[in-house]
Swiss-Prot record:
Gene that specifies this protein: LYZ
Domain C-type lysozyme: 19-148
Chain's role: Lysozymes have primarily a bacteriolytic function; those in tissues and body fluids are associated with the monocyte-macrophage system and enhance the activity of immunoagents.
Active-site feature positions: E53, D71
Protein name: Lysozyme C
Family, as annotated: Belongs to the glycosyl hydrolase 22 family.
CC annotations in GO: extracellular region
Amino acid sequence: MKAPLLLGLLLLSVTVQGKVFERCDLARTLKRLGLAGFKGVSLANWMCLAKWESDYNTKATNYNPGSRSTDYGIFQINSRYWCNDGKTPRAVNSCHIPCSDLLKDDITQAVACAKRVVSDPNGIRAWVAWRAHCENQDVSQYVRNCGV
């Protein structure tokens, strides 16, 4: 009786954790999905952003009580402006996707939405973590020895 319960709890924890990318695996994936140089933003800057926003975790979420919105996924894309989570007041959903799409292990939709975000006038500066940890920094370490 205890073994099936333990197995069930183990599987649940794996499901909730999602995929945590290895650094170079994420760098190769982002390059393949066209983020390297998109809107003038280097792959190293995207990697720095993903490191500080989610620690490369596809299932990362962060609730913002002030705006009653939530940041979702590897890029921590916000439900106020970019996706629909069904609970954020006055959500815009500029990426035209459910926020749950940003939590998938396949980050194709997250990358497409990140491209939409960075295409706005604020560009990469839309992300607080990028401004705090990546702007005007040597971000080459995030792609070092990845062959990208």
